[in-house]
Curated annotation (Swiss-Prot):
Belongs to the HisA/HisF family. It comes from Rubrobacter xylanophilus (strain DSM 9941 / JCM 11954 / NBRC 16129 / PRD-1). It comes from the Bacteria. InterPro entries: Aldolase_TIM, His_biosynth, HisA_bact_arch, Isoase_HisA-like, Isoase_HisA-like_bact, RibuloseP-bd_barrel. The gene is hisA. This is 1-(5-phosphoribosyl)-5-[(5-phosphoribosylamino)methylideneamino] imidazole-4-carboxamide isomerase. Keywords: Amino-acid biosynthesis, Cytoplasm, Histidine biosynthesis, Isomerase.
Length: 243
């Protein structure tokens, strides 16, 4: 076995109405605006040492089609680091549009869960640059901007994706997202034991990052609220990750 890849801390830039916001537990009615200038925020994260950014088109997630691609293109030009982009990407044309906008990796959620043929075609198109979002509430995958329960277990879906050749998933425990209550280590570890996993939801500081970085199969973490609320600095999280 070769050396473990460096653990990546992804500062989150969640876009809604052209602004950088955070939602609590995916609830569009519980929104907090953190920055009216997402492009400037992306530059700031890069300046402070981020090796990649996680950008979510929340308007797209709710509408079922990409909405913020022009802004994502601006962020990609300004940031100087790779973007992992998701939100409303449900067709191959959406995948290609995200790539044209500057996405280094594309996160596909709802369509990949609901339509196996689509995810196989997306995998053929993107290869290792495809990340499938496994968003779970109480261990059951949710879709359509987290508004619907799929009835599929997170571990079950992870197993299917691994068998198909998907290289990574983004696992979000919805109950923790935007809360700063701490990462869902046990549930994340269950998925990461099946397929390489980027953790998301609830990370509150360096202790969570250290614990995730030590968990077999966890290759990164998306951090939003903890950074925007000042619970931790990016520098602290990068140091905890070993980078």
């Amino acid at each position: 076995m070769g050396p473990r890849e460096p653990f990546v801390v992804f500062p989150a830039i969640d876009l809604k109405g052209g602004r950088c916001v955070r939602l609590r537990q995916g609830d569009f009615g519980r929104e907090r605006v953190y920055d009216a200038d997402p492009v400037g925020r992306a530059r700031e994260w890069e300046r402070r040492g981020a090796r990649a950014l996680h950008v979510v088109d929340l308007d797209g997630a709710r509408e079922g089609r990409p909405v913020q691609l022009a802004l994502i293109r601006e962020i990609a030009r300004a940031a100087g680091v790779p973007l992992q982009v998701g939100g409303g990407i449900r067709t191959l044309e959406d995948v290609r549009a995200a790539r044209r906008a500057g996405a280094a990796r594309v996160v596909v959620g709802t369509a990949a869960v609901a339509d196996r043929d689509f995810r196989l075609r997306a995998l053929e198109e993107l290869g290792a640059d495809l990340v499938v979002a496994v968003d779970a509430r109480e261990g059951v995958v949710a879709t359509h901007g987290w508004q619907r329960q799929s009835g599929v277990g997170a571990a079950e879906l992870a197993g299917e994706l691994a068998a198909e050749g998907v290289r990574a998933v983004l696992f979000t425990d919805i109950s923790r997202d935007g809360t700063g209550e701490g990462a869902a280590l046990e549930r994340t570890a269950e998925v990461a034991g099946i397929i390489p996993t980027i953790a998301s939801g609830g990370v509150r500081g360096a202790g969570d990052i250290r614990a995730l970085a030590r968990t077999p199969g966890v290759v990164g973490a998306v951090v939003g609220t903890a950074l925007y609320e000042g619970q931790a600095t990016l520098e602290e999280l990068l140091a905890a990750a070993g980078g």
